[in-house]
Amino acid sequence: MATVNKTPVIVVPVIDRPPSETFPNLHEHINDQKFDDVKDNEVMPEKRNVVIVKDDPDHYKDYAFIHWTGGNIRNDDKYTHFFSGFCNTMCTEETKRNIARHLALWDSKFFTELENKKVEYVVIVENDNVIEDITFLRPVLKAMHDKKIDILQMREIITGNKVKTELVMDKNHVIFTYTGGYDVSLSAYIIRVTTALNIVDEIIKSGGLSSGFYFEIARIENEIKINRQIMDNSAKYVEHDPRLVAEHRFENMKPNFWSRIGTAAVKRYPGVMYAFTTPLISFFGLFDINVIGLIVILFIMFMLIFNVKSKLLWFLTGTFVTAFI
């Protein structure tokens, strides 16, 4: 029997949902296993650091399951240094909130402690995902070490033809990857601890992120030579449910006729409603404008240009403005 450091599996909250629902089979396999809450200025509890490796076909004992509760910009403005002055004014609240969760984690005492303990990789998953079978993680982590991969992104943003490279090829899992570009996602990924520390250090030194977060991450990757791969067909292993975020957005809107219509539509068209409610820009920090809001603004411009005088159209447009802008 050998003792090794456990690989942390960290659930990052983006919606109101228990972390256990991201890994629904966790408690089924290890009855006494619970998520440890870790927030700013805390480290992983000692009892979770070491595991005796033995017959464990489901691999749950390889990992320390963590619920990250730090980086909440709603409660504290100490994370503003992650963003430039322009982004603090023009980036949407949702964008800043979600990015700050990850950057605060990478910049935390928790990650510094992991580096000191020689923990190589961390698995990070936002809680609007579901991973039912984690057995793919063990061979993936080994392959990442062998192939010197710094980040493995487990959600695809752009689909199409890519040049794929074999990552894992065994009797249970066949996994390919391709090199990432500007298609950056923080939804689910495995990252080398030292890489996370280096990225956040570069962001802070440059004065914080501007509005083009994903372009800036790609730029930093090129500058400090980070090898980021994207898992091909990642939805087979990590299920992302756009309905959960879309419902969360409607629940946080002011209650009105259109928000109720939207809540009902989410159940039938989750992908469409997720896209329509995605915030695009903040109006000087006063309110965020999403895709529906942008359409409404363009429609208002159309009515003004063509001098539309229909009271019904102006009334309906006004209700959209109060609901989505």
UniProtKB/Swiss-Prot annotation:
InterPro entries: Poxvirus_P35. It holds the Pfam family Pox_P35. Its main location: virion. Does not contain disulfide bonds. It is found in: Virion membrane. It is a single-pass membrane protein. It comes from the Viruses. Residues 1-285 are virion surface. GO terms for cellular component: membrane; viral envelope; virion membrane. Induction: Expressed in the late phase of the viral replicative cycle. One of its GO terms (biological process) is symbiont entry into host cell. Keywords: Host-virus interaction, Late protein, Membrane, Signal-anchor, Transmembrane, Transmembrane helix, Viral attachment to host cell, Viral envelope protein, Virion, Virus entry into host cell. Signal peptide: none annotated. Residues 307-325 are intravirion. The chain crosses the membrane at residues 286-306. Belongs to the orthopoxvirus OPG108 family. Envelope protein that binds to heparan sulfate on the cell surface and might provide virion attachment to target cell. Immunodominant protein. This is Envelope protein H3. It comes from Variola virus (isolate Human/India/Ind3/1967) (VARV). The gene is OPG108.
